[in-house]
């Protein structure tokens, strides 16, 4: 499992790499999993917003089937998702979240897709 995701999208990245390696993904329909959302970082936190946005872009960079897919996704993210999120941050009074979103985008523009530099202080 790639260590450069840290919080979000690591299992999706792992899943895509497993499938590309020729393995099958199976489902156990009787399995029951309990997942308490946002226990480790909180429902509203800068840490969550940064890594959710950073890793969404990183996932596409690592797993998109073509450069065209990456370009289409980046355009959608920059021109639709980013303005929508910034409006929501302002509307909800989440100070500093817009800067973290821009930092997440900048990280993806300035770091290799295999970089283990998380771009966020964890201590």
Q: Could you describe each region identified by the protein language model?
A:
Residues 2-32:
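A short, conserved alpha-helix in the catalytic core of glycosyltransferases
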Residues 4, 36, 59:
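Residues that scaffold the ATP/ADP-binding catalytic core of kinase and kinase-like folds
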Residues 35, 53:
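Histidine-centered active-site/metal-ligand motif
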Residues 47-52, 67-123:
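Non-catalytic, C-terminal membrane-associated alpha-helical segments of glycosyltransferases
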Residues 62-63:
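Mid-chain, well-packed structural core segment of small domains
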């Amino acid at each position: 499992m790639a260590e450069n995701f840290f919080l979000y999208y690591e299992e999706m990245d792992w899943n895509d790499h497993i499938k590309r390696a020729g393995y099958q993904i199976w489902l156990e329909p009787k399995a029951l999993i309990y997942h308490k959302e946002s226990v480790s970082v909180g429902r509203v936190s800068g840490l969550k917003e940064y890594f959710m946005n950073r890793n969404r872009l990183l996932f596409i960079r690592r797993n998109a089937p073509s450069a065209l897919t990456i370009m289409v996704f980046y355009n959608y993210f920059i021109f639709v998702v980013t303005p929508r999120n910034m409006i929501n941050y302002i509307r909800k009074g989440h100070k500093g979240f817009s800067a973290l979103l821009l930092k997440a985008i900048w990280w993806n523009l300035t770091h290799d897709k295999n970089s283990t530099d998380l771009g966020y202080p964890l201590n």
